[in-house]
């Protein structure tokens, strides 16, 4: 690394502007917080900790709209992950994180380290990770370069998760041109624990040890946090030094060592935190702040894998597979023995001090001496201008696009071959979904389901996000994202508990983009309150742009639900001939942002209609009650492609068919009205089912042995062999990928 600048040179040359620190912030730090010019190391620490990625300085005012508590929440936002009570002294722990910028630059390592980072967040809370999920958004598959990025991303996720022995059980993958220059790779992890083992990222107790454990520190990932707080351009998209490199075998050892310490020797440990974004500085400063303490660190003691690392590099490195512990004085050697057994570094690099000062030593010199609060609590929140986008104002003045479907069968065949709808097994078959043998329902269904061993309980989990609807109507799109996640959870027979999120947007300095963020979070927050699903963790990923072209605003909702007794688990596929088929919810002419619109016009446009959240929630509540009473044979929520696609998906992987009569048009068969399900019910349960749901349930036909989907519509018919439809659906993506060769 080049010679560090003096404080005076920093003031004059302003290198901090390239590190996402503004001149206003630099002056505030110098004049108000420190009363002097910060040195090179200190300036680097401020640039990382004051980045949007670490501080949420632009998004905090919006994030306050989210509810984050209810009777089940044991730990909300602010720790490594959220924790929710699932009864019997047990808790589920979950969180999602984005790794968009690194994955765009280096898809394999970016995706792999995204998985590794979120797993560390889970076991830092004291939980054993039991499942991984993802939410992946790519450009179109007809681009050979995008095919390579898709392959790298999927392999990175699969390799890391498989080596860790943690199943990937659910997720979503979409394709749209808006993600061509900036992929979205959102990783979610779910863990299980006894409530007595919950940990905090806290450093307290004067004289207690600060211990560094795990892999050695290198120069990879330096300024990863600030890299994630700026958009891409042709000039900076080559910042591969900001991408971390992962080692899942090291992480597996780290997981086992940490859980052994937490579960067997809780009296040795004060707090524990993952070294994620901004590396040592973030974990150490946040732990000291949480414990209302000071901290004194000797960076010469930090295990390093590269020679001559500066204090700046050591503190800002985002090398993977590292944790920071606060250990009660006198137990340092005890802790070291545990990590020695696993072949891991475990070094005391500092102590907790009186007061709230953050002091770093390197090469015999003090290289940082600043208040802890200046890094964590004194960040200047920023207010952003908001402006309703011109495209939305114009769309509100125009009539919505209406399709003209002439052949419902041919249209269904085409839709099933669209990349976002088509079978994704070519991707998720690279993930081990059954390792640890707790998986009950794996990828390809509405939600993944795992059993809670030693109990009758199950956990359902899903990730959902549709940027197209949010792009056209951010507030309604935000509601739809939450309602879609809830529908996926309820479709399995589970009660939605809480959510995590990844808020993926463009440059917040653009008034239109900040308006999108504000409006969509407002819609999500309203839906969270209606469904009683607080936001317990998550992250914000802004600046998802390439050369000024922003992605569609894409909030991702990760939701977990509880199945009280797995005997009441409901599958997506139709179960038996003779079962009655019901459409739940009312169907409108909702084509704006739909797969049908994109397929037929090559674009999306129009306005997305609002819907009654309270009514949808009440309907789901009734449906869940019927499931718990054993009155539902199968259930599938309606999403991309509407009822037509959902009916086909319900019959795939079965030998069954359906004979249906609908008061819907050929167009409406593919409408994407929110809050609907297709449900099958045994004949003997039909009367009770109809009585409970009333007008929300429309009998549309029955399941047959024919393996044909036969639908009589108000203006035509659809008759298709299910095996033929399934073959088109299964072969669509492999055919696109082969076209590259």
Curated annotation (Swiss-Prot):
Q: Name one GO biological process term.
A: 'de novo' IMP biosynthetic process
Q: What is its main location?
A: cytoplasm
Active site annotation, chain numbering: 53, 99
Residues bound to substrate are 98-101, 120, 244, 318-320, 541
Tell me which SUPFAM superfamilies the record gives. PurM C-terminal domain-like, PurM N-terminal domain-like
Q: Which Pfam families match?
A: AIRS, AIRS_C, FGAR-AT_linker
Q: What class of enzyme is it?
A: ligase
Q: Which residues bind Mg(2+) 1?
A: 97, 539
The source's superkingdom equals: Bacteria
Binding residues for ATP: 56, 95, 501, 538
What catalytic reaction does the record list?
Answer: N(2)-formyl-N(1)-(5-phospho-beta-D-ribosyl)glycinamide + L-glutamine + ATP + H2O = 2-formamido-N(1)-(5-O-phospho-beta-D-ribosyl)acetamidine + L-glutamate + ADP + phosphate + H(+)
Q: Where in the cell is it found?
A: Cytoplasm
Listed A to Z, the keywords are: ATP-binding, Cytoplasm, Ligase, Magnesium, Metal-binding, Nucleotide-binding, Purine biosynthesis
Pathway terms, separated by semicolons: Purine metabolism; IMP biosynthesis via de novo pathway; 5-amino-1-(5-phospho-D-ribosyl)imidazole from N(2)-formyl-N(1)-(5-phospho-D-ribosyl)glycinamide: step 1/2
- Indicate the segments annotated as coiled coil, or none if absent: none
One MF term in the entry's GO annotations: phosphoribosylformylglycinamidine synthase activity
- Residues annotated as binding Mg(2+) 2 are 121, 274
User: What biological function has been recorded for the protein in this entry?
Assistant: Part of the phosphoribosylformylglycinamidine synthase complex involved in the purines biosynthetic pathway. Catalyzes the ATP-dependent conversion of formylglycinamide ribonucleotide (FGAR) and glutamine to yield formylglycinamidine ribonucleotide (FGAM) and glutamate. The FGAM synthase complex is composed of three subunits. PurQ produces an ammonia molecule by converting glutamine to glutamate. PurL transfers the ammonia molecule to FGAR to form FGAM in an ATP-dependent manner.
Family stated for the protein in its record: Belongs to the FGAMS family.
What quaternary structure, including any partners, is listed in this protein's UniProt entry?
Monomer. Part of the FGAM synthase complex composed of 1 PurL, 1 PurQ and 2 PurS subunits.
Task: Identify the NCBIfam families for this entry.
Answer: FGAM_synth_II, PRK01213.1
User: What protein am I looking at?
Assistant: Phosphoribosylformylglycinamidine synthase subunit PurL
What organism is recorded for this protein? Limosilactobacillus fermentum (strain NBRC 3956 / LMG 18251)
């Amino acid at each position: 690394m080049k010679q560090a600048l003096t404080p005076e040179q920093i003031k004059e040359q302003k290198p901090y502007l390239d590190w996402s620190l503004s001149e206003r912030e630099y002056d505030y730090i110098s004049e108000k917080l420190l009363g002097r010019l910060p040195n090179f190391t200190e300036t680097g620490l401020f640039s990382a900790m004051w980045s949007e990625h670490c501080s949420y300085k632009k998004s905090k005012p919006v994030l306050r709209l989210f509810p984050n508590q209810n009777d089940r929440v044991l730990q909300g936002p602010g720790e490594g992950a959220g924790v929710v009570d699932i009864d019997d002294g047990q808790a589920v722990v979950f969180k999602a994180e984005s790794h968009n910028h690194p994955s765009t630059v280096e898809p394999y390592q970016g995706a792999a380290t995204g998985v590794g980072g979120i797993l560390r967040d889970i076991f830092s809370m004291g939980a054993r990770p039991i499942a991984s999920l993802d939410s992946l958004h790519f450009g179109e598959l007809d681009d050979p370069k995008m095919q390579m990025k898709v392959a790298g991303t999927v392999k990175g996720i699969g390799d890391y998760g498989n080596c860790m022995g943690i199943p990937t059980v659910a997720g979503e993958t979409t394709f749209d041109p808006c993600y061509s220059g900036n992929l979205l790779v959102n990783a979610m992890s779910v863990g299980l624990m006894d409530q007595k083992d919950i940990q905090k990222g806290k450093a307290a107790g004067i004289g207690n040890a600060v211990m560094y454990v795990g892999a050695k520190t290198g120069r990879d990932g330096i300024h990863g946090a600030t890299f994630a707080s700026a958009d891409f351009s042709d000039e900076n998209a080559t910042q591969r030094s900001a991408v971390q490199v992962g080692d899942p075998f090291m992480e597996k050892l780290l997981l086992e060592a940490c859980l052994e310490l937490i579960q067997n020797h809780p009296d040795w440990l004060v707090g524990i935190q993952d070294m994620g974004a901004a590396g040592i500085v973030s974990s150490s400063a946040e732990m000291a702040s949480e414990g209302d303490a000071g901290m004194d660190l000797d960076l010469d003691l930090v295990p390093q894998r590269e020679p001559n690392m500066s204090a700046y590099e050591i503190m800002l490195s985002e090398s993977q597979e590292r944790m920071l512990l606060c250990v009660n004085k006198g137990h340092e050697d005890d802790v070291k023995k545990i990590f020695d057994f696993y072949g891991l570094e475990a070094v005391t690099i500092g102590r907790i001090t009186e007061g709230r000062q953050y002091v770093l030593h390197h090469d015999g010199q003090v290289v940082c001496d600043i208040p802890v609060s200046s890094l964590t609590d004194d960040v200047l929140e920023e207010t952003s201008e908001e402006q309703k986008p011109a495209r939305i104002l114009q769309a509100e003045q125009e009539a919505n696009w209406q399709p003209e479907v002439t052949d419902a069968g041919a249209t269904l065949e085409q839709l099933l071959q669209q990349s976002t709808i088509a079978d994704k097994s070519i991707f998720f078959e690279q993930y081990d979904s059954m390792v640890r043998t707790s998986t009950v329902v794996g990828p390809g269904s509405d939600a993944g389901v795992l059993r809670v061993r030693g109990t009758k309980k199950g956990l359902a989990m899903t990730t959902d996000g549709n940027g197209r609807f949010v792009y056209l109507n951010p507030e309604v799109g935000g509601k739809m994202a939450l309602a879609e996640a809830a529908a996926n959870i309820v479709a399995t027979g589970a009660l939605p508990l809480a959510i995590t999120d990844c808020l993926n947007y463009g440059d917040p300095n653009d008034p239109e983009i900040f308006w999108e963020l504000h409006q969509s979070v407002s819609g999500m927050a309203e839906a969270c309150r209606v469904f009683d699903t607080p936001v317990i963790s998550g992250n914000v990923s802004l600046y998802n742009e390439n050369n000024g072209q922003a992605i569609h605003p894409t909030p991702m909702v990760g939701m977990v639900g509880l199945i009280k007794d797995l005997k009441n688990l409901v599958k997506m596929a139709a179960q038996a001939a003779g079962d009655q088929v019901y459409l739940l919810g009312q169907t409108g002419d909702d084509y704006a942002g739909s797969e049908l619109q994109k397929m037929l016009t090559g674009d999306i446009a129009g306005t997305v209609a609002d819907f009654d959240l309270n009514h949808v929630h009440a309907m789901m509540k009734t449906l869940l009650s019927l499931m718990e009473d054993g009155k539902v044979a199968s259930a599938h929520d309606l999403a991309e492609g509407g009822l037509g696609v959902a009916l086909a998906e319900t019959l795939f992987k079965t030998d069954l068919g359906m004979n249906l009569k609908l008061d819907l048009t050929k167009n409406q068969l593919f409408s994407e009205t929110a809050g609907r399900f297709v449900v099958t019910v045994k004949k003997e349960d039909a009367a009770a089912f109809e009585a409970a749901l009333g007008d929300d349930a429309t009998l549309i036909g029955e399941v047959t042995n024919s393996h044909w989907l036969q639908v009589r519509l108000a203006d035509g018919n659809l008759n298709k062999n299910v095996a033929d439809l399934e073959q088109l659906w299964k072969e669509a993506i492999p055919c696109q990928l082969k076209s590259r060769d």
